[in-house]
């Protein structure tokens, strides 16, 4: 019995910042952005879009009428939540017209949240061979002007349909988790911009 990603699609806003122009404005070598982080453009979300609209746009083209009946869980992974209580998955579930007997949750852990979302979907589907799970990663990342994280900003969403007998990617059972409380990146409550601390890389010690 195999479980994995059966369909995948993405959505990015039409607006962007040219990374070479940003480098010139910041007085740095363009290759620092173009080759160093491999970016030529940085997506910018207009005020009319957020993680809900981007997530729904990413998912709508991979959902058939049969899929809408088969999806029994919607998970949105994001660090750009628009509500402290209500999951954005609930709104996306409604916009996509997915059948009502579905679980809808939101997961958060910086840029890692989509990984445990996929793992949760896999575990959930092991007991449900005829059902599907829609996993969406959607974010609007913002850093301060001229900050170290400025060139890594962006906006967009990826939607993945997980099911049995996947056509794109089969998930393995092996995984090794590791957690350490490090303030390299965080956004406290009330802050509009993310904070970043860049230090020399360290190798975690084994216990």
Please describe what each predicted stretch is.
Residues 10-11, 77-83, 109-113, 137-142, ...:
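Acidic, glycine-rich active-site loops and adjacent beta-strand->loop/helix elements
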Residues 32-36, 40-53, 79-132:
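Conserved catalytic cysteine-centered active-site region
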Residues 58-72:
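Phosphate/pyrophosphate-binding loops at sites that engage ATP/ADP/AMP, CoA/4′-phosphopantetheine
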Residues 16-17, 85-87, 118-119, 144-150, ...:
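Short acidic, glycine/serine/threonine-rich loops at helix termini
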Residues 1-40:
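N-terminal amphipathic/basic leader segments beginning at the initiator methionine
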Residues 162-169:
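Channel- or pocket-lining gating/hinge segments that regulate access to a cavity or pore
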Residues 126-160:
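Flexible, glycine-rich active-site loops centered on histidine and acidic residues
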Residues 196-200, 204-207:
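Single conserved hydrophobic/aromatic residue that forms the stacking wall/gate
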């Amino acid at each position: 019995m195999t479980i994995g990603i059966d369909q995948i699609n993405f959505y990015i806003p039409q607006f962007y910042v040219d990374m070479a122009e940003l480098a010139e404005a910041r007085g740095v070598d363009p290759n620092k952005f173009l080759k160093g982080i491999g970016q030529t453009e940085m997506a910018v979300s207009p005020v009319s879009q957020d993680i809900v609209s981007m997530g729904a746009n990413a998912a709508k083209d991979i959902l058939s009428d049969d899929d809408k009946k088969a999806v029994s869980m919607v998970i949105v992974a994001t660090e750009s939540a628009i509500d402290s209580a209500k999951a954005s998955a609930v709104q996306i579930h409604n916009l996509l017209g997915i059948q009502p007997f579905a679980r809808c949750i939101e997961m958060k852990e910086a840029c890692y949240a989509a990984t445990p979302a996929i793992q949760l979907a896999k575990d959930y589907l092991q007991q449900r061979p005829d059902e599907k799970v829609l996993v969406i990663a959607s974010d609007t990342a913002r850093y301060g002007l001229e900050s170290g994280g400025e060139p890594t900003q962006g906006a967009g969403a990826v939607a993945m349909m997980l099911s049995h007998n996947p056509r794109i990617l089969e998930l393995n059972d092996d995984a090794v988790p590791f957690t350490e409380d490090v303030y390299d990146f965080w956004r406290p409550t009330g802050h509009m911009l993310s904070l970043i601390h860049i230090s020399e890389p360290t190798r975690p010690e084994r216990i």
